């Protein structure tokens, strides 16, 4: 029989149809199996009262690998930082810097007296004097001192003035819980931030109660402690001006304990620090009230690169950094920064990428507000489209902490055994746990969102369940 006879051609075409059918059937079987894993996970008795949102997509093709209630908006906690940071890097790029401007009013006479004020304009840099910035915490103040000495200034007749007007009020979201704002993770967001807008309090057990063993920064605040040992941490903080009163219990196995509390006026702390440094340098600040004079700029002090700020933010889940970046977004279209305008920028931006704004209820940039809600599909869209960005996609992926090694996911899936690289931003608060990020293999990359509200198991048990889910789903992906 000729190779090109009608019968041979029919046989060849029939074979092709069978192979195509088997290929399609095989693919459908894999997809169904993956979806079945998700469905079985969601049917766990611990999730009977839960709200669950899951969406896993192939970044390259955009195909949805598996999903569950992907359009239901639920509380994301800190995974909402992905929306804040991805939008910022796409609008401003990783090499962008914020600037704090230093100058003075009036003139400097031949005796070295500045007849005016020293003026610092906050530029929205959350890393100024931060423990987590690339330069040491005193670098900004040291540069001011050096500039004053190079101008032969021996005294400043006026005040040290900090202009904090670039960001609109409120500094603290009205949606945040009152009990959160005393802690460093609930500190206010100002155009002029300094030393992470927080104080560090070190406590030592004396056999009956806890003594204050140290305060950083020192000699700036008064702390009164009435703390004893208990089953768990249960601490109440009251603050008035620079005086903190702390009461409650500390876990009984801890003889030393460290607390980080928010400060309401970072500008006041900075002025006190700078005045002290001026005094050491032999420069007197007289604090006289003077009239209005023209202003002369000395220098613009740059922040770390935005990309470095985002990496630090995502690995450490820093709320202050996130809130500052949210306000930075609004400056792309407005003269002053505000959270509300920043959120409006986010909504409009992602509408261009088929992210349905009806699935986003956003009230801050950090995720501290329990009113925040977002769908797994919306969050996945942000992940997917950002990873596809030719200019910043790979950079953004690397800003997320590596599961099993870094940040809040340092212990999550530590022994998962997945062949690829799993980078996840976690989010957690009372009755809320979530992960969002990427799984990357040499051949493919997948965007992953898993959010669960109101589970009835322990958080440790929930982490184990999610770990098992991701292991089953992702181990099938090469």
Task: Show the residue positions of the predicted features.
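Bacterial Sec-dependent N-terminal signal peptides
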Residues: 1-36
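Residue-level signal for short segments within beta-strands and strand-turn junctions
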Residues: 56-58, 104, 440, 452
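Conserved serine DD-peptidase/penicillin-binding transpeptidase domain
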Residues: 41, 91-357, 472-476
């Amino acid at each position: 029989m000729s190779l090109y006879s009608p019968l041979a051609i029919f046989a060849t075409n029939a074979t092709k149809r069978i192979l195509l059918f088997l290929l399609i059937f095989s693919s459908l079987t894999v997809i169904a199996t993956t979806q079945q894993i998700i469905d079985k996970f969601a049917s766990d008795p611990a999730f009977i009262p839960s709200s669950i949102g899951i969406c896993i997509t192939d970044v390259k093709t955009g195909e949805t690998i598996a999903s569950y209630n992907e359009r239901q908006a639920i509380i994301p906690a800190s995974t909402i930082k992905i929306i804040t940071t991805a939008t910022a890097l796409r609008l401003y790029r990783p090499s962008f810097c914020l600037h704090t401007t230093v100058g003075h009013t009036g003139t400097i006479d031949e005796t070295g007296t500045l007849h005016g004020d020293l003026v610092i304009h906050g530029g929205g840099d959350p890393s100024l004097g931060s423990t987590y910035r690339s330069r040491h915490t005193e670098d900004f103040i040291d540069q001011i001192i050096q500039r004053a000495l190079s101008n032969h200034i021996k005294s400043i007749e006026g005040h040290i003035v900090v202009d904090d007007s670039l960001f609109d009020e409120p500094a603290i979201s009205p949606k945040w819980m009152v009990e959160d704002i005393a802690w460093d993770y609930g500190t206010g967001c100002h155009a002029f931030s300094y030393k992470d807008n927080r104080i560090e309090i070190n406590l030592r057990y004396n056999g009956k109660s806890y003594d204050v063993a140290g305060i950083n920064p020192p000699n700036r605040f008064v702390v009164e402690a009435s703390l004893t040992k208990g089953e768990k941490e249960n601490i109440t903080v009251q603050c008035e001006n620079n005086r903190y009163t702390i009461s409650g219990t500390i876990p009984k196995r801890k003889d030393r304990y460290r607390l980080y509390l928010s400060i309401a006026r970072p500008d006041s702390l900075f002025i006190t620090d700078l005045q002290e440094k001026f005094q050491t340098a032999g420069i007197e600040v007289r604090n006289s009230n003077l009239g209005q004079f023209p202003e002369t700029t000395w220098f613009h002090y740059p922040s770390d690169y935005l990309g470095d700020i985002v990496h630090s933010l995502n690995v450490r889940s820093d709320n202050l950094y996130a809130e500052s970046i949210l306000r930075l977004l609004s400056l792309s279209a407005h003269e002053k920064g505000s959270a509300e305008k920043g959120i409006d920028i986010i909504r409009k931006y992602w509408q261009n990428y088929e992210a349905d704004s009806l699935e986003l209820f956003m009230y801050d940039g950090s995720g501290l507000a329990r009113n925040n809600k977002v769908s797994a599909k919306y969050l996945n869209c942000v992940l997917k489209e950002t990873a596809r960005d030719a200019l910043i996609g790979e950079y953004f992926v690397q800003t997320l902490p590596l599961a099993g090694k870094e940040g809040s996911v340092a212990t999550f899936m530590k022994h998962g055994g997945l062949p690829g690289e799993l980078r996840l931003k976690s989010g957690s608060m009372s009755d809320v746990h979530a992960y969002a990020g990427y799984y990357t293999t040499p051949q493919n990359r997948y965007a992953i969102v898993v959010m669960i509200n109101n589970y009835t198991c322990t958080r440790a048990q929930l982490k184990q369940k999610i770990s098992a889910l991701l292991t089953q789903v992702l181990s099938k992906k090469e």
